[in-house]
Swiss-Prot record:
Record's signal peptide: none
One MF annotation (Gene Ontology) recorded for this entry: rRNA binding
Function: One of the primary rRNA binding proteins, it binds directly near the 3'-end of the 23S rRNA, where it nucleates assembly of the 50S subunit.
Gene3D superfamilies assigned to the protein according to its UniProt record, in alphabetical order: 3.30.160.810, Translation factors
Keyword field: Ribonucleoprotein, Ribosomal protein, RNA-binding, rRNA-binding
Native organism: Lawsonia intracellularis (strain PHE/MN1-00)
Name assigned to this protein: Large ribosomal subunit protein uL3
Matches recorded under InterPro entries: Ribosomal_uL3, Ribosomal_uL3_bac/org-type, Transl_B-barrel_sf
Lineage: Bacteria, Pseudomonadati, Thermodesulfobacteriota, Desulfovibrionia, Desulfovibrionales
GO biological process, alphabetically ordered: translation
Pfam families referenced in this protein's UniProt entry, alphabetically: Ribosomal_L3
GO CC list: cytosolic large ribosomal subunit
Family named by the database record: Belongs to the universal ribosomal protein uL3 family.
Length: 210
């Protein structure tokens, strides 16, 4: 398993540990795995090499019938989250039902973590895009936090796509790179990551080698 691969995990929260120099290090506690392999996709059949892994045991009422059959075919119980991991190399060292754990990583490794950012709801242009806003007084009325002009009049006659305006903020896919593994606790499937990672507490994450 020399090829770089990742596993699914769940953010449990943040704490701090003390390094060898005695300084406190902020870390994010992540439950990484165990992730059984549900399906192996190959170039010959699907057109590309990939592993389909699962994480977090789920209830029958939360899993569709098609996915229930998919898990049953693999001889596995039901899971809440499923993820596909593309690989370039050979898949001979993997088999359906094989479990991937935090043993894939080592202390000091650099990893990248993908998750969904914390949702902020509907926000104005000042908070969402850091706009300056209008004057507080002297001729300014009811537009103190307005976005301002959003385009010309006759030409082009419409608002360009991508214009920064008020709207929903957060719950977007975010990837943070070059995060360092501070500690690994295999008996609890716990991995400690230096610094913060995307998403709220209990959200799902995908952790892969940098």
């Amino acid at each position: 398993m020399s090829e770089k691969i990742g596993i699914l995990g769940q953010k449990l929260g943040m704490t701090q540990v003390f390094g060898g120099n005695g300084f406190a290090v902020p870390v994010t506690v992540v439950q990484a795995g165990p992730c059984p392999i549900v399906q192996i996709k190959t170039v010959e059949k699907e057109g590309y090499n990939a592993l389909q892994i699962a994480f977090g045991e789920g209830k029958k009422k939360h899993v569709s019938k098609s996915m229930q059959g998919h898990f049953s075919k693999a001889g596995l119980s039901l899971y809440r989250k499923i993820q596909e991991v593309r690989l370039k190399g050979s898949l001979t060292s993997y088999e359906v039902g094989q479990v991937l754990t935090v043993g894939l990583f080592s202390v000091g490794d650099k990893v990248k973590i993908t998750g969904k950012s914390i949702g902020k709801g509907f926000q104005g242009a000042m908070r969402r895009w850091n706009f300056a806003g209008s004057k507080d007084s002297h001729g300014c009325e009811k537009v103190h936090r307005a976005a301002g002009s959003i385009g010309n009049n006759t030409f082009p006659g419409h608002v360009f796509k991508g214009k920064k305006m008020a709207g929903h903020w957060g719950t977007e896919k975010v990837t943070v790179q070059n995060l360092v593994v501070v500690d690994i606790r295999p008996e609890d499937n716990i991995i400690l990551i230096h610094g913060s990672v995307p998403g709220p507490k209990n959200s799902f994450l995908f952790i892969s080698m940098q």
